[in-house]
Amino acid sequence: LYDFCLEVRDQDNCLIEIVPYAIGFRRLEIIDKVIYLNGKRLILTGINRHEWEPHKGRCITEKEMRIDLMLFQQNHINAVRTCHYPNQIPWYYMCDEAGIYMMAETNLESHGSWQKMGAIEPSYNVPGSIPQWKEAVIDRAQSNYETFKNHTSILFWSLGNESYAGDDIEAMNQYFMDQNDGRLIHYEGVSVNRSYEDKISQVESRMYATPDEVRQYLDQNAKKPYVLCEYMHCMGNSLGGMDSYMNLLDKYPMFQGGFIWDYTVSYTHLRAHE
């Protein structure tokens, strides 16, 4: 990072304000369907992270954030997805400082509208292509972008989580495309509504695809680089067989890794009645 200092002066050249900022430079691009960062293939050994602490709930402090980053580095985690909402502002500065890649997710999740009794049934889904929702979801995308657009650590803008796909999310995708800020757009929902796969998301994204399913996609004239936005559901005593995914990184350049679900088990400390 570089220390940048912006001086704001009035028409008489009198200093009004000084704005310091830590900025960085990086180049993100897709070449032959492979994502490259500064000329090198991007490999994500990432994690999904909710904002949570057993005693404070979602009201975490910078102390907990720094502990998280320390554990990231100890466990070779190089990326984080802000599932499923923008996080506290200090977290983005800390990821800039620590060199942690970010997938900055927009605050949108509606899988209860198109998944009914565990089955995909999208006859009515939100936001879908409902005109009344369009401006609302674009507003959420704009809030995410305008708040965090200057953070070097953000490589991906994510349109949300498990919200199917329709014209409204396509409009969100177009909003981020119009910013032309050198980042990539991610959205997993097109994997369940393929009619939008050429209109939404610059990466193929899946949740909990098996290694064989990843291999099958990449062996069949794949259209986009592949990112697992959630995989290896590792709550409790699990995470076995992860080498099956890691081996794919060596065989398929288009497989870029992913984000384990999830960082820590979210639990609450309660005191039993005496």
Q: Where are these predicted regions, by residue range?
A:
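Substrate-binding/catalytic cleft of secreted carbohydrate-active enzymes
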Residues: 69-72, 79-271
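N-terminal carbohydrate-binding accessory modules
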Residues: 7-72
